[in-house]
Design a protein with these regions (language model features):
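Helix N-cap motif at beta-to-alpha junctions
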Residues: 18-19, 72-76, 202-205, 241
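A cross-kingdom feature marking solvent-exposed beta-strand/loop segments within repeated
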Residues: 38-41, 50-105, 127-128, 179-183, ...
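N-terminal beta-strand motif that seeds the catalytic metal site of vicinal oxygen chelate
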Residues: 1-20, 64-69, 122-150, 163, ...
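Internal, well-ordered alpha-helical scaffold/interface segments
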Residues: 150, 154, 158, 191-194, ...
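Conserved active-site tyrosine of GNAT-family acetyltransferases
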Residues: 22-27, 84, 114, 152, ...
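Core segments of cupin and vicinal oxygen chelate
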Residues: 4-51, 98-99, 105, 144-182, ...
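Conserved short beta-strand elements that form part of the metal-binding/catalytic scaffold
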Residues: 32-65, 115-123, 165-194, 199-203, ...
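Vicinal oxygen chelate
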Residues: 2, 85-135, 172-173, 218-257
Length: 257
């Protein structure tokens, strides 16, 4: 059975110029809950045990500030630091106590394309919440635009221990557990965030959630449909700051034992 040093996608940090509107949207419409507000930032949880899945930070423009993954063991930090450097990344802060509300130990690196990646171990877990008919459980994946898909995929494979699951003409799908993909890398003229996907309990939850979004004045940007790679159901929307976000469910599970 494959061992992954990185075991899951946990959260994203988003800068937004409309943080009050964004908080209302993600809590009243999208189905997340506030965990804590702290100095211009809002931490939002889903129904799963992750301390938060989105951290909103007041800023002058919409931007992806960081992606946080969880590592299997504190012993994995040292090896990741070496392979990140070997593959063109940079360790910005070595493993140390996390001053954020999620606690634990965190290491921060910059990938070859400039994005910040955080790796957490021993971070705070919360008691799961009842799964409502339209509420996300956790993050499913992030989709990143890249000027060099193959180079980006290679970094995730060789530096971070992900495995390539699928490769289409324009996208690479890499995973760090049995989910078909945790990161998608899409061919684009500039590097950056394409979208963030939230896992829903099932197809019915995607449909119910989509209905709530439409009723609240947020039309479906694309969907409801089913992707080829990953076989997952999808519905895409645009949040108040312009970020593309996705409800998804029924993600293909990969068994390579």
């Amino acid at each position: 059975m494959t061992r992954f040093p990185v075991t899951s996608l946990r959260s994203v940090d988003l800068g937004t110029p409309v943080i009050d509107r964004a908080e209302r949207f993600y809590t009243s419409v999208w189905g997340l809950e506030v965990v804590i507000r702290d100095q211009g930032s809002v931490y939002l949880r889903a129904t799963g045990s992750d301390h938060h899945v989105v951290a909103l930070h007041a800023g002058v423009r919409p931007e992806l500030r960081a992606i946080t993954f969880r590592v299997d063991s504190a012993d994995d930090f040292a090896a990741l630091g070496v392979t990140v450097a070997e593959q063109g990344g940079q360790v910005l802060s070595p493993p140390g106590a996390n001053a954020g509300p999620d606690g634990g130990t965190v290491m921060t690196v910059r990938g070859p394309e400039g994005g910040l990646l955080r790796f957490a171990h021993g971070d705070r877990q919360l008691a799961p919440l009842p799964q409502g008919g339209y509420r996300p459980v956790r993050l499913a994946h992030v989709n990143l635009n890249s000027i060099d898909v193959d180079a980006s995929a290679t970094f995730y494979e060789k530096a971070l221990g992900f495995r390539l699951t699928d490769r289409s003409k324009a996208m690479a799908f890499v995973r760090c557990n049995t989910d078909h993909h945790a990161v998608v890398i899409a061919d684009a003229p500039v590097n950056g965030l394409n979208h963030v996907a939230f896992l829903m309990p099932d197809l019915e939850a995607v449909m119910r959630g989509a209905g709530r979004l439409i009723d609240a004045g947020f039309p479906i940007a694309w969907g409801v449909g089913r992707h080829g790679p990953g076989d997952n159901v999808f519905a895409y929307f645009i949040d108040p700051a312009g970020f593309v976000i996705e409800y998804t469910a029924e993600v293909l599970q990969v068994d390579d034992s």
